Structure formats: C-alpha cells, structure tokens
Amino acid sequence: MFNAEEKLMIQELLARCAYAYDERDLDMLASCFSADAEMTMCIAGGDVVGPFKGRDQLREMFENAMSGQQDVRRHVISNIFFSELEGASVVYSNLTLLATENGNTKLITAGIYADHVEFSQSECVIKKRHLDLDSGY
C-alpha cells in the first residue's frame, strides 16, 4: 500500500493529468503516463474500448478526442482512495466532466478511474488506467 508521501504524489499526478487535458497540453498529458502505459475505457456499460498501448498511442488517442471537442473541458477529479486488488495497489477516483460553450456550462458525463501507478526516482506516472464512464462524452 502507498505511504502518505506517495499518496500526495499520486493526487498531484491525477490533478496534473486532468489539467493537461483541459489545457490541451499533450506533452504534459503524455508525461503523466509511463512509456509502456495502457488504457482502456467502457462507456455506459458497453464494450471495452482499447487497449491503447504506449505513451505515443495514448497521446494520439487524446489528440484525436480533442480535435472533435470545440468546447472548453474541465475534468474534475474527486473522491480519491487507495485499495488493493489482486495483490496490486490501485487508485480509484471519480471523474466529473464539465464543458463550457457559448457561455453555458453543463455536465457532460461522470465516471470512475482505476489507476495503477509506478514510482521511479522522484517521479510518479500512470502505468495502467481504466475509465468507466456513465455516458458518452
């Protein structure tokens, strides 16, 4: 399980990842993931999308998603907690996705992230991420 310092680093990582997406900073966003990271997602209980493997493929997936989004996105990460699953430490957090367009802000979707993170030297990155969304985005 994670110690207090590691938990703080993980919370910073999740905030940085959300901020990078919202600011469309693909370099910062990609740096939140390990070189061999993997991500999957499931929308409204449908089929699993992915896996997207490796930092480059993740960056491309994020860039493609951003290209179709003309609104201003805000990823709000909350209810972060730490658990053990099959011998691995997992970080769970809630996503609330808001969007503003033409001065109107609305809820787009909500979901839950399940992240496996790794530490190297003084850095913390996402190694594996799964996102369960309540509805499309």
Region roles according to the model:
Residues 4, 49-52, 104:
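Charge-dense, low-complexity intrinsically disordered segments
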Residues 1-23, 27-35:
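Short, low-complexity N-terminal intrinsically disordered segments enriched in polar/charged residues
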Residues 28-94:
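A solvent-exposed, acidic/Ser-Thr-rich amphipathic alpha-helical stretch
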